[in-house]
A protein has these predicted regions:
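Non-catalytic cap/lid and distal C-terminal segments of serine-dependent acyl enzymes
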Residues: 10-342
Length: 342
């Protein structure tokens, strides 16, 4: 027997909220609209004259986790349901997922200059970033442009979107993932490699693309005493909640629609990017699933509240566009870590 997911009233958009066209205008000098052709930043070139960090890898297993024992999506009529524009519709967890095992690969970049109580960055969907970040950090650390930080680049528990382990971790608006990082992931890294991490929130950053990006923001939002630096590519600030939560009925859309506007400003710095042709760029607003629109709204609200925010809108670019990442990542890291002791 299948049960329909509960329907929640969709609150009206705040009429006082700045509304961006596509592309948005610059709000401050910090914001930018960039155009193709996109090119690799010079920091990607390996320089044998600078100290080279090491990349280590290990696996975490679901049976060893108290916080994420593991789920898999149930392939049924509910989990397969889409709206007119092809978006999955949120549903209660019991209707779309069941217990299931996963293996999670974790990649750790340790710079040659590492010290005790090191600054660090947690990177979601880690295998997608670790190899391209290593030469960038080697060069930038040697040049004194960023601190000698450790990168903890972790994969999710697998699959994607509603009903999946990745969706549960990344698209859920709660402190559960941040607690997992604090209580299970970082201790596992320290135990294996003998490194230690700073407790200073100014020395703790988090990064991701797509759902990994909203996850990064969520880590800082719920625990700004842990994380105060966020780097977001094509953040999923849309209605992709997993599982459905009556407290946040529109998932990540709630951040710019209700949560940030109603809350006191938090001490978070965020660099964020979206592509002109990002996911569902031509979907109407009432789908709550248009990435450029959601990121435009997010940037507007952050500026309105006085956050330290840089917004990059990439013309003729897609979702977590690799060309854009390879052009902007070094400057994004430098902006994010400005002012921190090198």
């Amino acid at each position: 027997v299948f049960f329909a997911a509960p329907v929640f009233a969709q609150p009206a958009i705040d009429p006082n909220l700045p509304k961006f066209p596509t592309p948005p205008p610059k709000v401050t000098a910090e914001d930018s609209i960039i155009d193709p052709p996109y090119a690799d930043a010079p920091e990607y070139k390996v320089d044998p004259a600078v100290p080279q960090g090491e990349i280590r890898e290990f696996i975490l297993y679901s049976e060893d986790s108290k916080i994420y024992p593991g789920i898999v999506r149930i392939e049924n009529e509910i989990s397969a349901k889409r709206d007119t524009y092809g978006n999955r519709t949120p549903a209660p967890e019991a209707q779309v997922s069941k217990p299931g095992r996963y293996e999670r690969h974790v990649f750790v970049y340790i710079p040659k200059q590492v010290k005790a109580n090191a600054p660090f960055m947690v990177v979601q969907d880690g295998r997608s970033y670790i190899n391209r970040m290593a030469p960038v950090l080697d060069n930038m650390i040697a040049a004194g442009r960023v601190p000698a930080m450790i990168i903890v680049a972790t994969d999710s528990g697998g699959s994607d979107a509603q009903g999946s382990q990745r969706g549960l971790e990344y698209d859920t608006l709660s402190d559960r993932y941040s607690n997992w990082v604090e209580q299970e992931l970082l201790p596992a890294v320290s135990q294996r490699y003998g490194v230690s991490f700073t407790s200073d929130p100014e020395g703790r950053a988090t990064m991701g693309g797509s759902s990994g990006a909203i996850c990064a923001w969520t880590m800082a939002w719920y625990h700004p005493e842990r994380y105060r630096k966020v780097l977001s590519y094509s953040g999923t600030f849309v209605n992709q909640a997993s599982p459905l939560d009556p407290k946040t009925p529109r998932g990540g859309w709630e951040y710019h629609a209700t949560m940030i506007p109603k809350a006191a400003k938090k001490p978070i710095r965020i660099w964020m990017e979206v592509g002109e042709k990002d996911n569902h760029f031509d979907d109407p607003e009432n789908t709550r699933h248009n990435w450029p629109l959601a990121n435009n709204r997010m940037a507007a609200v952050l500026k309105q509240k006085g956050y330290d925010n840089k917004y990059v809108f990439a013309m003729n670019a897609g979702h977590v566009d690799n060309r854009v990442v390879r052009q902007t990542l070094p400057s994004a890291l430098e902006w994010l870590w400005r002012g921190y002791p090198k």
